[in-house]
Amino acid sequence: EGKIVAPRIIPYSMFPGRQIVGDEAARKWVRAVKKKGAQGVKLRGGTREALVAVYDEAKKLGMGTASHHDQNGVYHVNALDSARAGLDSMEHWYGLPEALFTDRTIQHYPPEYNYADEQWRFAEAGRLWLQAAEPGSQHWQEVMAEMLALDFTLVPTFTIYEANRDVIRARDAEWHASYTLPALQKFF
């Protein structure tokens, strides 16, 4: 039909990560995507200096910021570091267990771990919670309190993973006809 059923689309531009080096280059990139119509920026990683500059410049321009903290970059900027630097929201949950570490900076993965294997990556990512502070512990409480004080938003993504576990039920969901893109409907 060509109709948009949602109230509106809020376009976010994807930050190119380590291709942008330095404070001024990051700010210049944010200004450029704002000029092209982006209302926000999504990040997957980059240098600490560039990430902080993106958060700051986006805020100055009234843009939103969201980050999928790539697992191979959270050792130097985890979700709490990003929240303190001005990030608005954390996508999925990557970077949160690392913010809850008390005895390490880098995640412990088995020596044979293959980051390129998505199912293995998801399994190991889930095990990161076993390396984090115990729920309810002092460190856990401090991290959660600080994130709340910073008005930091956590945006978990569970629906499609549930569909992977129960495709038959998800295939017949009543909202598909109205909301699922035709290309994605082929998955179901």
Residue ranges and their predicted role:
Residues 37, 60-64, 84-90, 150-151:
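Glycine-enriched alpha-helix->loop->beta-strand junction motifs that scaffold or abut catalytic
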Residues 9-13, 41-43, 65-67, 90-92, ...:
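Hydrophobic faces of well-ordered beta-strands that scaffold small-molecule active sites
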Residues 26, 51, 140:
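Aromatic/hydrophobic pocket-lining residues that form the small-molecule binding cavity
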Residues 14-17, 46, 70-74, 93-96, ...:
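Active-site beta-loop-alpha junctions enriched in small/polar residues
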Residues 19-32, 73-81:
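Short, acidic/polar
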Residues 2-7, 11-12, 52-70:
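Alpha-helix-loop-beta-strand connector modules within alpha/beta enzyme cores
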Residues 29-41, 96-188:
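Active-site neighborhoods of metal-dependent hydrolases
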Residues 32-33, 54, 58, 82-83, ...:
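Generic structural signal for hydrophobic
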